[in-house]
Structures are given as C-alpha cells and as structure tokens.
C-alpha cells in the first residue's frame, strides 16, 4: 500500500523513500540491530533499526549531513534535536500529524524518546495509524506501511517545505579515478563531511541550508596532511548537480519559433560588465534533450565576459526552476546538459591539474543553489532578499557598515586637500546636503606630481607605494576626513594593491610574464607572508586617514601571469591552477582581515568596473561602480535604464556613476539604483570647481534629495513591469516594493521615439485587502486605488511627452 502526502513535496518524497527502503530491507532479509555504519552510506551489513530507517529515509530525501558511523540515534534525544536544528517543525499533538512526519514515542525516565518511525496517515478504524517502522524483526519482514495504534506519543518533526540539495554534489578525478569510484572513508559532522582519500589527503565539504530562502550552499576544502605529494587532481567541478526536470514538449514547428513563448526548458545566462551597451544582459537559451552548453569568464576575472550567476527554468508554465551561483573570483567554466527528464549543472575550475604539496591546504569554489516553484519573479525577489540579508556585509552585520549603498560625489585623488574641502563648502552652501560620502578615486599616492586633468589622467597608473602624497595632502587626508565626519559624511578611498608598477616601487614579491617591457606586475599575494604584508600596509592607511569605505580596483588580467608561474614552479605541468587558487584564497583572506579589523568598514569591489562580481565577493563587498561604461561622459541614459534593471535581477546592492552634466531629470532618474556617485566636480582643472559649469543648483537640490529619500527602495523587491529594451520606440518601467511596509515606487520612462502616451502594467506585491495611495513625485498629485482593483485591472501609467520619466511612490491607507 502506497500513501503520499497531500500537501507537501518533501513529505511525499519521504513516504516514497520509506516505501522503497522498507521493501528493500524485507526482500534482502535485513535483521533488527545496531548497524555499524549508517545504512544511508553503506548497508552491506543488512542490519536496521527504527532510527537507522529514519536516517536512511531522510538521507534519500536530501538531508545528507548525517554521521557516517552508526547514524543518529533516537535516544538522547539526538535525532529529535537534529531534526529541529535542520529546520523541521515540532508537532505536539497526534491530531496535527501529516503523512511524512517523523514520530517519536515511548518516553524514557528523562522524557526522551525510545522509538521513532515515519508516519503514513490515519487508518480506517478509529485510533489506528499507518507507519513505516523497523523497530523489530516482525515489522522488517512485513509489507509496509503497517496499521497500528499510536501509543505513548511524545512529538513529531515535520520536514521544511523546501527540499535541501543533496551534497556532496561535486566531481573530480584523483590519480585518474573518478571521485565516486575511489575507496574513501567519510566522517560526518554537524555541517560537514570529511572524506579521506586513499593516500591520506582530506576533502572537507562544508554545507549550509538556509531554510528561510530555500538555499543550499557548500564549499570544498582540501588538505594534504601527509609528507608526500598527492595524486593528480583534475576535472574539478565543485558543483556537479543533476536535478529532475519535466521532459520536453513535442517538437512542433511552433515550439521552435523564437517569436513564440516556448514551453521548453530555458537556461538563462547573464553577461558580465563588458563596458558596452549590453552590460548584465540576461539571455535565455532553449535547451532540448541532448543539448549541451558551456560558458566561461575571461582572463581570470570572475565577472568579465560572462557573470557567474545562472538560472534554469523548467518550461511548461515556467513556475519551476533553479538559481545557481558559482563562487570563484578567478577563472571558471560552467557546463549545462539537458537530459530526457533532468538537467545537469557543473561549475568547474578549468585550469586545475595539480598535485598537492605536503602540508598544503586550500579551498576551491563555493556553490549556491536555490530551487523555486513559484515563478521567476518571485524566485529572484527571494534571491535578492537572500543576498541582502544573509550574504551582503551590510545585511549580515545589521547596519554596522550601513544599510544602503553610498550616495557620493567623486573627486580625483590629485585635487589638493584644501581645494577638496573648499569644493565641499561650495556644494553644501548650495543646499546639496543629500550626499553621505566623499569618494576619492585614483591619484592620491606617491610619487605623483601632476596638477592638470590631462596629466593626472595619464599618471594615475603609477601605483605601488600606498603612501598618502604629501605634495597634494600635507596632512595626510586627516584634515579632510575630520571635516567630513564633523558634517555627518563619510570618506571613500581608491586602492589597487594587487597591481604594482615596477618603475615606481618594488615593495614585495611579485609575478610577471617575463617580458622586460612588462612594467605592471602582480604581487604574489598567494604567499602568506606577502598577504600579511599587504594587510598591514593597507590597514595602516585606513587607520591613519580614517577611511570609511575601502575601494579596490583591479586593472589587470591575471590568468596568463598565473599560468606562467605554474609552469615555472613545475615544468612537468603538475601544479596547474595552484598559483590562481592561492591568490584567490589570500585575496579573500585579505578582505576578511580588513572587515575584522575595521567593524565599520565597507568594501567597494571595482576591478575595472564590475569585472569581479561573484557571490564570494558579494559576501565581502558591494560593487559601487558596476561598469566602466559610466566612465563615458554623460553616458546614454537608456543604457543606464537597461543596466539597472538587468543587474537588479541578481543584485539588490550596486551602484553606478552619473554625469558630469546636471539638469536633465530623465537622464538623472535613469541612473537610479541603490548607489550613485555624481561626477560633476571630479577633476582638477578650474572648470571642475563648484559653479564652474553653471550647474542648476535648485534642480540639483530637488532631485538629489529625491534620490536620497527613495534610494532604499532599490534594494527591496524588484518587478520588471516593462522589461529593458535596446530600442528607442518603447517604454521601460520597474517597480520596487518594500514588503515590510507595503510601500514602494514605480519608475517609468517613455523613450525619445516612443509614440505611446500610456502604458498598462501589472504590479507585484499588492495586498488585495488594502487601499494604495499613489503620489506623482513631479506634480505632487495623489490618487487612491483598491488592492483588488490593482490585481484585477493593473495600473495605467501616463507620460504626455516623449523622452520623459514618471516616478510614482505608493503606500497603504
């Protein structure tokens, strides 16, 4: 008899595996007793008990971080506590039980359970209940589920609504043998499995399941505690995951047309920051059974070329799918394969082919996966909340590093301190007090002496000393930061410590291509002693200057340099990838050290403008200059509209630059995202001083204040009402909704050649029980619409003139 849970996917999975396992233990003549090994890992002994059955069933349902030896015992109450620690809900009455619950009965003298089983539903007779139970030989030999009275009930545990991903979901070859064919031992701890490979090398898979978001994360850590080199590690995929997906629909002519909304599976791949009109574009790729696709980044920078964030959507009604993130700040490659009824995802480090040295240890890429069943928009909003609350340093540290990205005015580092403060006096005297940061970019360090915009723009790349230039800043910038802090503002300072110019300063060990003409070199941060030197060198500047936001650039493509260092280290080619791995590990260690030393510090991840945006960097920083496209003078507003909407699909926190020209509301609002820096007074020449461009200060006061007041919404839930487009004859519109306060904004643009005065949109996040008052931020006019009306009819937006914007805020009444 087969029973399924009426309301839960995981409950159904638990019942399915319970039935299969109970049939197996009956047919293979298992006996009751204490198994020497958790049968979820190895059941060759054919010994089973009540708790080992539950262990085995839960493992098959995806709860894999279990002890290898013996398993979780029911007494103690070890199994009960384990369930609650893993997001199960405690059930305290028999009347509340649902099929798939783990039931605990027969209390001992301490009140702890002595017996457990899988509940399978109420029986036909009063007081009788179905169960899967291996508590004695008679039950093991029977056909289950059995129907028995439920006596001495203590409690039950119900699995969370989102199934965890079964890990370890990784693959590699070791000495030519695939991981799943190696003779290994496994030791399970609370959040990790430690595998000991045949030669003593240890692989530790650390896992985390975040129930609030349905996210599973894991990282793989390698250690060679032996006195000899390891076998060759190759074909390393830190994520190798196959997930069930519905079979393809029939291959009809219509389903092959790209103008038709397909019911086929789609893989969504995002562009990185490539300094062009298409930055962060998300492109769907239809994949039929047998199709294969692979993508990679460029030149060793994780967000250059292709971004390491992916989505697979099942097809059909498009409600089911999975979001994934590859956590590696170096070179990566991703492979995707469509099966008949499944989909395989692999995240690899393609450069790795190495033997570990004695005593060597490192970690490789992390994997983050989030299955979803409520559609793409809901999934990406849950992802945004996950990044905002559980990943980003702003969310994780509960506001110690701020709660929003900065609103800044940017200045070149060669503007003398006295003049910089004079410019700020001018900015503030015109009522432009919405800024919360002064952003100082390149050019503030020794040995520079240039005094014009042209020469400073040419000389800034002479880096390496990381000493404040006393020619420009006699007091070492401390007078500037004191000035700012007294006025409630903060100070952001640019660095590029991984690159060093040999003609300037050879302050530490470095790597290079070997060419005498190669003046820019890569410091050898992969060496622990170099990393330690860097931590001290940069920490000294942060402390002495009073830096609030540390901005790290990286104008260097490191892959070729890493590969040369690997060849130099081992001409036999058995250390490929080692230099890169240690560089990335110590880059993370460097940032972690700064965050630990300076609890207030925010880190800005630049890397040539968005070239290293990955989930590992997002866990330590925010990208405040998302693309060097913003280096373009008064860059195209439509590109900013598109870029902001495309990036919002994955990142709640990010920023771009604007300007220098002020006065165009359409263009300025096109730059609205969670962080912005204004370029109007950026450079050294006199025309860049406050008032030098005849700035419209009244306009600036109004719209700077508008942006600062509404900025927080751009980190909330995002709804693409009219998707981004590369044509100029359309509208684009987005909604940002604050779930906690049931308020938000709608930002819409009618482009320059668009003939339509009105657009009809369907809003997200609306509560049918509430009424919403909308306010036009240009006219001040308000109107009220019932939630039921908004959900039934949507909302009509009106922009009377071409190349104009509409900004509506709303709240409940």
Show where each model-derived region lies:
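Aromatic-lined carbohydrate-binding/catalytic grooves of carbohydrate-active enzymes
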Residues: 402-536, 545, 549, 559-561, ...
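C-terminal beta-strand-rich structural cap/linker in extracellular carbohydrate-active enzymes
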Residues: 786-813
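Active-site-proximal substrate-binding groove within the catalytic cores of carbohydrate-active enzymes
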Residues: 168, 174-180, 186, 587-782, ...
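Glycine-rich, aromatic-flanked loop segments that form ligand/cofactor-binding clefts
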Residues: 168-180, 308-327, 372-388, 392-393, ...
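Short Pro-Gly-centered flexible turn/kink motifs
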Residues: 354-373, 803-811
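N-terminal capping segments
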Residues: 1-68, 112
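Polysaccharide-binding surfaces and accessory modules of carbohydrate-active proteins
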Residues: 164-340, 350-352, 771-784
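...with weaker cross-activation on analogous glycine-rich loops/strands in unrelated enzymes
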Residues: 8, 12-15, 63-142
